Amino acid sequence: YIYTSYVGVPGLVRTTITDNVINADIEWELTNNTPETRAAAVTWNAPNGFGVLGTWQTNGRPNYLNTEGELKLSNTILNTIRKVIPEGGNCPVDYRQSVDFEVNDPEKRDVEVSVRFIGGTSSAASAFGYYCYRGEATKAKIAATKKYIIFPNTHTRDAKAKPVGLKGGECVKLHYIDENGVDQGTVFPNGVKIGWFLFNDSFKKNGNKGNITLYSTPKANSNGRTYTAAFRINDFVVLSFEDYTIDQDYNDVQFNVWSNPIEAIAPEVPEVKPDPGTDDDRSVAYRMTYKGILAFEDNW
């Protein structure tokens, strides 16, 4: 096997050795993907009280992926993220802050929001989701919001026989969930804030027993702690979560979040210089119409 902590590519790759030469096809390899239904899942159902955007397969691969939003990320973006929040490193204090996305289109157009899976370094199989709210984020308000699962399984390492159901760059379009917990479709009105949660190592563990949920809204966390860091690579915003073990590297699971139109989501965060990359990928890094990345540090 070849192992890498490089985010955005498969973390564990099978190899062969012939005449002292190592051979490997560096491709995403998913585990079994038998379809399952929302009502009769044979492996993992969303915990009671959580909403879902559709059905998924037994490896946690959503049946509602948005292929139009799928993207191969440039080396420029991936190298920059890796250098800022490396595996086993220490995320700079200046970037540690709380950032939930707020929809605010200056022209008051219809806004759609999507999330793209980037990858991660975790050996945990965690579910990732979101919630919508308006105004001040009180603990009671966030507790009352309807939580929706986007990706039931964010595991990418094929470690400890855990399933792999996602490839880097795959995408889901979100739905606006109003204050009554009702799905209002894909158009988000101005003034709505979107928070995020990571249900740590929950996939295939029968609901929420023995797992910890980490939130991007500090008041929603039991200790009130800010677990997020944020920085900007040109117009590309990275958000990260620190886990319960507080190992400070903030890189376990990462996501790209953007809006259409792109002006509708524009958080104010510190800027870092992009990695130079190569001539053949710079145009990709700057022309794509995405607005941000979420990176979660889990509780593994």
Regions flagged by a language model, labelled:
Residues 1-300:
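Extracellular distal adhesion/interaction modules in secreted or cell-surface proteins
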